[in-house]
Each structure stands twice: as C-alpha cells, then as structure tokens.
Amino acid sequence: MYEHLKRYGVSKNIIEAMNKIDRKYFVPENVKDLAYDDIPLPIGFGQTISAPHMVGIMCKELDLKEKDKVLEIGTGSGYNAAVMSLLVGKSGHIYTIERIKQLYKIATKRFKQFGLTNITCILGDGKEGFEEYAPFDKIVVTCYSKFVPNKLLEQLSDNGILLIPVGDEFVQVLKKIKKINGQISEEDLLHVKFVPLV
C-alpha cells in the first residue's frame, strides 16, 4: 500500500511496519474513506494525523533500530507511535506524551487493540520531555515549536537524534539534530506543516 514511499528513500522495513498498522483505525469515522490517501487528516481537537509519507520520512530520518528508547511529543491518535513500536522491536520502547485527554484515551485503547506492549502513553505536557526515563536514543516532536526546547536536548543521549519542526504557523522546517560527544549539530531537512506545540 505504501510502496510509493520508496521515492522518498523510505526503506522496506518501514513500509512493512506501516502496512501492518492499519491507518483506518487511527482516524475518526467521518474520514475513514480517506484513511489510505497520502494526506494529513483531522482527528479532532484541532489536531491532525500526519500524511503517510511524512510518517515514513520521519521514521527514516530517526534511523530507528531494535532496542532504541524513543520519546515522542504529541501522540495524537497514536499511529506514528504504533509504527515506531514495530521498528524498535520488543527490546525497544516508545514513550509518547499527549496533552489532550480524549486523544490520550483513544491512543491508549488502540495500542491495547494492536497488542503493542512496548508503548507507554503519558498524559501531560511534552515541552518538558520526560526526565524520569531519560536519556532517549531518539526524540521526535510531531508539532512545531518556535525554538528547540533545551529540556529535549538535555534528555537526548549521546549519538542520539532529535527531529523537530521549527518555525511559525506560516513557515516550518523539519530539523534533524544530533548529539555527538556532547556536541550538537543541526540539519534542515524539508519544509513541513504541523500543528503548534502548546
């Protein structure tokens, strides 16, 4: 279903993971007919589920591996976390934070339905990260920020990768930030459109 993602450099194992997690279960009833289209969709509460190509690109840029401990800021309906959970395997773990209680409940229910036991969903403010389980091998933020929060950099492990859209409501760039021997490097990947980190 997602073979077209190869043109974005998305690997076979990411495409396989996306095919295993049926997107239609992560969107509201009124947009289920569009679940397999490569577009973002509204999931209520002013939030969206990312287009499949964006999920694929972000998974690729995170370079997810077995055993990775991942922090996601912005669970939404849970689709991205579900895909990532397959990529890190049973020995890895996804910690995902959602501030909207209704979405948190929906995502938690979906994770149980899919038998995804390597995901911990937290109801709270993601701007502070999740110090209790830091450091993280990978951190992904699924909403834009005007700057890179220091708390997230502090919670990134050495040789870790942080993906975050940075900008404003009009222009956002997906940044890939690496920490190597305590030094931070930044790379601008592409222009994106996300909801704000609030």
Curated annotation (Swiss-Prot):
Transmembrane spans: none
Where does it primarily localize? Answer: cytoplasm
Catalytic reaction annotation? [protein]-L-isoaspartate + S-adenosyl-L-methionine = [protein]-L-isoaspartate alpha-methyl ester + S-adenosyl-L-homocysteine
Q: What class of enzyme is it?
A: transferase
Q: Does the keyword Transferase apply?
A: yes
Name the InterPro entries for this protein.
Answer: PCMT, SAM-dependent_MTases_sf
Q: Name one GO cellular component term.
A: cytoplasm
User: Is Transferase among the key words of this record?
Assistant: yes
Could you name the active-site residues? S50
What would you give as a GO molecular function for this chain, any one? protein-L-isoaspartate (D-aspartate) O-methyltransferase activity
Q: Which family does it belong to?
A: Belongs to the methyltransferase superfamily. L-isoaspartyl/D-aspartyl protein methyltransferase family.
Role, per record:
Catalyzes the methyl esterification of L-isoaspartyl residues in peptides and proteins that result from spontaneous decomposition of normal L-aspartyl and L-asparaginyl residues. It plays a role in the repair and/or degradation of damaged proteins.
Q: What is this protein called?
A: Protein-L-isoaspartate O-methyltransferase
